[in-house]
Curated annotation (Swiss-Prot):
Name of the protein: Probable nicotinate-nucleotide adenylyltransferase
Family assignment from sequence similarity: Belongs to the NadD family.
Statement: the UniProt record of this protein carries the keyword rRNA-binding: no
Gene Ontology molecular function: any one: nicotinate-nucleotide adenylyltransferase activity
Organism: Bacillus licheniformis (strain ATCC 14580 / DSM 13 / JCM 2505 / CCUG 7422 / NBRC 12200 / NCIMB 9375 / NCTC 10341 / NRRL NRS-1264 / Gibson 46)
Amino acid sequence: MRKIGIFGGTFDPPHNGHLLMANEVLYKLDLDEIWFMPNQIPPHKQKNSFSLSMHRVEMLKLAISGKEQFKLETIELEREGPSYTFDTVRLLKDRYPDHEFYFIIGADMVEYLPKWSNIDKLVNMIQFVGVKRPGFQIETPYPLVFVDVPIFEVSSSLLRDRIKNRQPTDYLIPDEVKVYVKENRLYET
């Protein structure tokens, strides 16, 4: 049975905080791989608020290249409509019956779990992994495994603003992603 961490998000753009979080979960939970899974239309975000899927996929490929245990999973981009975790997990379990899935969420998403579609069924299908900051307490009635990750204060929205305002992004995003963003003139307006 392969142990696979699923890391969903818009990754618009992917940054070093994403990579740090994935790497910490990979090693602390002794997983075989982390699959980065870009969302089609996350239910909690506006439809036109992020870059084209092809750009996000290409940036993710660049960000995770060279890390053998990091993979790209595009199952949510293959479907139409909103990306609900329950539907995605059902598809993944059908496609990969010999895999055990660990769904990685940030501390900020833990409080929203009661609002997730089919959450009571979902917690029986996968293991949720809550990524938290050292010393940050999270209360939830759901069975979560918590992983402490070093503090790295960066977000994709911060990076989009910095790029738009021509501020430096050094050490915040992988160099290959930075080049891709510049060559494709992403986030300039």
